Design a protein with these regions (language model features):
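Flexible, active-site-adjacent loop/turn segments at secondary-structure boundaries
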Residues: 18, 42-45, 51-52, 56, ...
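S-adenosylmethionine
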Residues: 94-98, 102-218
Length: 218
């Protein structure tokens, strides 16, 4: 990792209340290098620069960290190249993380990173949360579900409902979201979920507005 990008990772993590130890920085460096290498042959991400990955994948993933308690069982829906689930596991080692994606090559990459970084308490699953077999395996299993790039918020909430424990939390990571849209979602989902919190912020080192929506299953 270039010194400039290392500094961006450190300062960006600090902005979210995370103090990255040297070992964590080295792990992120390995993740970064492997992602860029694999991405030359497999379309894992449209972001192809070190700086872009550090900001738009690593820091964006870490932005939700303070909303996830330790020892939480977390399902990352549509996890792609492992975001946000793998970075969250890297900094919150007590999490029990399940990654699920419908693209086998992306799941193969996730498994490669998990092995390379020797991460425990994390699994990568090839499948779709819409599939009956997946639902039967995962019904009422998770404290939290999270989605960063999977479908729209309403679809994510619908698919999460059976997989969450009662009182569990569905976390939607989204771009700029208006107050009107937030209130509309809250009203539409009122019978199944309660909007517990929503947080808007600007992603460090960018002008990108982001919104985190936390819905509690009723």
């Amino acid at each position: 990792m270039e010194p400039e990008n290392r500094e961006i990772l450190l300062r960006g993590a600090e902005a979210f209340g995370i103090d990255l130890a040297e070992g964590a920085i080295l792990a992120f460096d390995i993740y970064l290098r492997e992602l860029l290498k694999w991405n030359q042959k497999i379309n894992l991400t449209g972001i192809r620069t070190e700086k872009g990955v550090v900001i738009k994948h690593f820091l964006d993933s870490l932005s939700v960290c303070s909303h996830i308690p330790g020892h939480t069982s977390l399902l990352d829906v549509g996890s792609g190249a492992g975001f946000p689930g793998i970075p969250l596991k890297m900094v919150q080692t007590s999490l029990q993380v399940t990654l699920i994606d419908s693209v086998r090559k992306k799941v193969d990459f996730q498994k490669h990173i998990v092995r390379l970084l020797d991460l425990r308490g994390i699994e990568a699953v090839h499948g779709r949360v819409q599939e009956e077999e997946v639902v039967q395996e995962m019904v009422s299993r998770f404290d939290m579900t999270i989605s960063r790039a999977f479908s729209d918020t309403a679809t994510f909430l619908h698919l999460s409902h059976l997989l969450l424990k009662r009182g569990g939390m569905a976390i939607a990571m989204r771009g700029k979201t208006t107050e009107e849209d937030i209130q509309r979602l809250s009203k539409e989902e009122g019978r199944r979920y309660r909007l517990q919190k929503h947080v808007s912020f600007v992603l460090p080192f960018t002008n990108f507005e982001r919104t985190i929506l936390l819905f509690e299953k009723q």
